[in-house]
């Protein structure tokens, strides 16, 4: 068979990978709850009065991965997994990095992601982030589940080389993690209440 005979056409009908970030109280979790048959992996206690299926509040990276593994390996009828929220998950990931690497290369004890120096901690954090994304990819590719990552927004200064600098909203994540997640997602959506 020639390489030209292997060309496929048409749409790829895989479930979507979505990140929705926005200002506080805009309805990000409500958006996730309106997805087809959602189940929430909570990393923050913010679902309030939403009537939605949810795992108990994750207090560690292992709790998050256990929820992903349960959705992968056990029978269920959920169609969407909602991680609420990515920025609170990042805090759990930083704790996991410190658990995995409790000292610097020079033997100094680590108590904060900043203690590694030269942004090494944030680079180390990309490994557990990839583990999470790999697990979510398995849910999407092998279990047919849509993935929604909820994140809060922050305002940051953007130095545009073609125009004047300006403030803009971005996900409240470290820039390396944010870039990794945004590249992984099919859609990156922003929600605001301004008209």
Regions found by a protein language model. Give the residues of each.
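Alpha-helical scaffold elements adjacent to nucleotide-binding pockets in ATP/GTP-utilizing enzyme cores
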Residues: 67, 89-92, 135, 180, ...
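A short acidic, glycine-rich active-site loop
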Residues: 109-130, 170-174, 178
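Conserved P-loop
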Residues: 2-97
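Catalytic-core regions built around general acid/base machinery
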Residues: 131-143
């Amino acid at each position: 068979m020639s390489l030209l005979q292997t060309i496929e056409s048409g749409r790829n009908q895989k479930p979507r990978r979505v990140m929705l970030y926005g200002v506080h109280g805009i309805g990000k979790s409500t958006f996730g709850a309106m997805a087809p048959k959602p189940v929430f992996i909570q990393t923050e206690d913010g679902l309030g009065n939403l009537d939605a299926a949810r795992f108990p509040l994750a207090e560690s990276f292992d709790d998050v991965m256990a929820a992903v593994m349960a959705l992968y390996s056990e029978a269920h009828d959920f169609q969407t997994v909602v991680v609420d929220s990515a920025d609170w998950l990042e805090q759990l990931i930083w704790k996991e990095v410190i658990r995995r690497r409790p000292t610097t290369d020079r033997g100094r004890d680590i108590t904060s992601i900043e203690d590694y120096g030269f942004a090494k901690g944030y680079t180390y954090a990309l490994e557990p982030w990839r583990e999470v994304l790999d697990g979510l990819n398995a849910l999407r590719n092998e279990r047919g589940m849509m993935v929604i990552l909820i994140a809060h927004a922050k305002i940051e200064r953007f130095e545009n080389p073609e125009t004047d600098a300006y403030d803009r909203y971005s996900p409240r994540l470290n820039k390396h993690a944010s870039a990794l997640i945004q590249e992984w997602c099919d859609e990156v959506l922003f929600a605001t209440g301004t008209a």
